Amino acid sequence: MNYIPTQTFYGRRWRPRPAARPWPLQATPVAPVVPDFQAQQMQQLISAVNALTMRQNAIAPARPPKPKKKKTTKPKPKTQPKKINGKTQQQKKKDKQADKKKKKPGKRERMCMKIENDCIFEVKHEGKVTGYACLVGDKVMKPAHVKGVIDNADLAKLAFKKSSKYDLECAQIPVHMRSDASKYTHEKPEGHYNWHHGAVQYSGGRFTIPTGAGKPGDSGRPIFDNKGRVVAIVLGGANEGSRTALSVVTWNKDMVTRVTPEGSEEWSAPLITAMCVLANATFPCFQPPCVPCCYENNAEATLRMLEDNVDRPGYYDLLQAALTCRNGTRHRRSVSQHFNVYKATRPYIAYCADCGAGHSCHSPVAIEAVRSEATDGMLKIQFSAQIGIDKSDNHDYTKIRYADGHAIENAVRSSLKVATSGDCFVHGTMGHFILAKCPPGEFLQVSIQDTRNAVRACRIQYHHDPQPVGREKFTIRPHYGKEIPCTTYQQTTAETVEEIDMHMPPDTPDRTLLSQQSGNVKITVGGKKVKYNCTCGTGNVGTTNSDMTINTCLIEQCHVSVTDHKKWQFNSPFVPRADEPARKGKVHIPFPLDNITCRVPMAREPTVIHGKREVTLHLHPDHPTLFSYRTLGEDPQYHEEWVTAAVERTIPVPVDGMEYHWGNNDPVRLWSQLTTEGKPHGWPHQIVQYYYGLYPAATVSAVVGMSLLALISIFASCYMLVAARSKCLTPYALTPGAAVPWTLGILCCAPRAHAASVAETMAYLWDQNQALFWLEFAAPVACILIITYCLRNVLCCCKSLSFLSATEPRGHRQSLRTFDSNAERGGVPV
């Protein structure tokens, strides 16, 4: 909780032990003491003289004390002390001594002043101290009702969090001021505690002080225990006779508690008294000292006075004083006190476009305005009748008073009905206002049943489509769920900061008051105040409260209107204005918009199946539930839908992340993990597969580049091998009788000569070298074994001799021969 400060361990009167030095201290060598023989002799001499003096005093006899002389005082004649302003000089001296004794603070007060010197700061408004702010733990606390700014440059610029529940404003203490803060404690054994004005008694969970010890301006002062810890902060007090009960904010073990005795008043210092004016004379608005300042004594003059002061700061104090006629005395407020302002107002008849039968009329229940700022779907309806007060200006919550012609009639509140597409549930009523929760619809109707059992109704076109609280369309508030912030119209009749304008009603013409009697016109007022203006004769203009007859006149020559300037009515655009439209009054309206928390259900958690860069959600809603998701990258993409049945949704999860929100559950954020197939340290194809899953474009580029490099290397190697073979075999081909070495023949795959056939060659080998003949049969077997081994291990790099011989161009083939000494044969092929 923000209003429970954290204990700090910075003591003002405690000095910590200095830090130990990490290096050993080296002992400084002590200089040798040189004995001073002269000083020793002088000391011995002084000791001997002192001993001799003490011995002589002991031997001398003690003298008896001298007898004290008694002072003889002459009797003085008694003189009567002079009286100054009804008090003698002695009494005046005693009063001064008593004042001096009172001004000297006691032990408790001195201790509190010593602690308060560091942890308390004045709150000033226009240079005047209105209260105090206190540093407790790691927070600075100031009563919310204290107007002004803390008299400290660092604390004045802090951002405070306000709590109307505890009447506190709280902010974090700057780091450099934490050493000045006081500790707090929740331990409060019964006994006496200390504050600025002395002792505070704590008993039965209440803090009390002697009456007169505290006063307005002490709001925000702390109460300390004997260890200097804060146990409570004073907000105000309630006078209970000899003692005053304090209204405080204190701490329990795990929570903050506000103790407010009955009848307690806030102890912020009063600001400049608001002044009102009457006939060029000023007076305090809350205490009018004039005769027409009571509505019950002179209603019309009182309303005129209120209209003259409508724009002054103390207007509502003047209104309260004029309606209660308290003249400075304070009255206990009650629920009926909130309805007291309506005795200066009256219901009225206004134009209504649809009176329930498809035609317009002047209805006593005309709808003026409909407000729907509340997020919970509550409607605040204003209409022309008044609820909670009867026609005798008495508070009665079972009555509705409405205008019936010039008269005011009562109806039963239970006959009030509000409807849209269906009947609405009425939550609260007061004055001109109704609180109701209605189903969706395209119109709004308000109706009552009058004294003749006739239905008086008014209907207006109004589109009402209440949005659900939260993200689920539920019909019944659950027992368990989640608390989310919302707004509603507070169901209280107390005064609010909202207000409506009132004005004096105009004169209403009424020809029914005129009757023709044998050439004369009779005006029957019926207890009303009537203005008349007849053109027959002279002087037939005026105002009357009783029946009168105008001689020798016709009804057509007279104009009669009922005037009533004893009550205000709402300044409606559907009602004619009075003769002076600039004059108006104001009254507070009930049911303010309040920030609260609403309990909403929580949808069942979805079943989540994770995939590769995607997630699959199985959604099972109990009622229409909103499902939405969005990406978390630089360009977020948002999607939402209302889910009414069990569905399955697969949504992508990019690398930047994704957030999905299901119903009133907390949003969930997911990021795709860098996973892929293959192995980073496996076979080549596994390595390629692994990196292709992570970086597909880079992997393809790398594989293509390596393949091109390998092909270029292979072609270059083949070209270099062919060139080297040609360079190696050309000299032997051009040199007659040159023999190719067998190693070079194997490396260069030298082709055999075509001088003799296979049979001739085999016959020659049989005759000349039979060992080589048998090796010729072993050569095919060896070739088969080599080819099999190469195919098995896939390590064959060279082509077969016949393949290289077949691929070589025919024109470039050379026959290698070797010759002996027989010139006729021309040589023998090898």
Swiss-Prot record:
The record marks 267-268, 333-334, 755-756 as: Cleavage. Residues 58-109 are annotated as: Disordered. Residues 94-106 are annotated as: Ribosome-binding. Glycans are attached at residues 280, 327, 533, 595. The active site is at 145 (charge relay system), 167 (charge relay system), 219 (charge relay system). Residues 119-267 form the Peptidase S3 domain. Keywords: Autocatalytic cleavage, Capsid protein, Clathrin-mediated endocytosis of virus by host, Cleavage on pair of basic residues, Disulfide bond, Fusion of virus membrane with host endosomal membrane, Fusion of virus membrane with host membrane, Glycoprotein, Host cell membrane, Host cytoplasm, Host membrane, Host nucleus, Host-virus interaction, Hydrolase, Lipoprotein, Membrane, Palmitate, Protease, Serine protease, T=4 icosahedral capsid protein, Transmembrane, Transmembrane helix, Viral attachment to host cell, Viral envelope protein, Viral penetration into host cytoplasm, Virion, Virus endocytosis by host, Virus entry into host cell. It catalyses: Autocatalytic release of the core protein from the N-terminus of the togavirus structural polyprotein by hydrolysis of a -Trp-|-Ser- bond. It is an enzyme of class 3 (hydrolase). Residues 65-107 have a biased composition (Basic residues). This is Frameshifted structural polyprotein.
